[in-house]
């Protein structure tokens, strides 16, 4: 009986284990490719908004200064005066990296920025604030969750210092995503409680897994709308 069960489920277990090992030990450093970085910078997709590795790759390129342009649906409308078009046409010494989607409001931007804080510290960024963000009621949880992922969560948990900003962000996160991963840790932050050593270990493990997963699968996520010409 056990042998038959192993023959059925054993290969699935081994395959799952191999996938986990591949993700955990996949190198998180990648070589720079300016053309691909321009593609990801101009793709203005939900994947480019959420995914870490392509953002970090572009923002750390020593041969081109990418500047984050944060907003919502403004960046989707490409025309002759779009910041990407102007930067390319007039050979400006920078390229915009667009982080915005229709429906992505301030809380999405806050958690998205957690992924790239070391890369943008003491550097420039452009932030376009939409009037639609200022409403009497919070926006729909489904809209928030569309642009939120576990890597943003662990980046936030790893960056937070237990201050009032982290507490407020944790409260809003629980409201928008009541079933968020590592909910117990987020609840502690929302109450202003200090995290234990076990909590920190859990954050580190999940953060490493998410970072490796982003490095592995992120290279396949930006392959669609190529709005830059190779030159």
Model regions: which residues?
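Membrane-embedded segments
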Residues: 75-164
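Hydrophobic membrane-insertion alpha-helices, especially the h-region
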Residues: 4-27
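Membrane/wall-proximal cationic-aromatic binding patches
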Residues: 30-94, 112
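Charged, low-complexity, helix/coiled-coil-prone segments
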Residues: 24-29, 49-61, 206, 217-231
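Glycine-centered flexibility motif
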Residues: 71, 103, 216-218
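Secreted/periplasmic serine-hydrolase-like ester/acetyl group-modifying domain
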Residues: 155-231
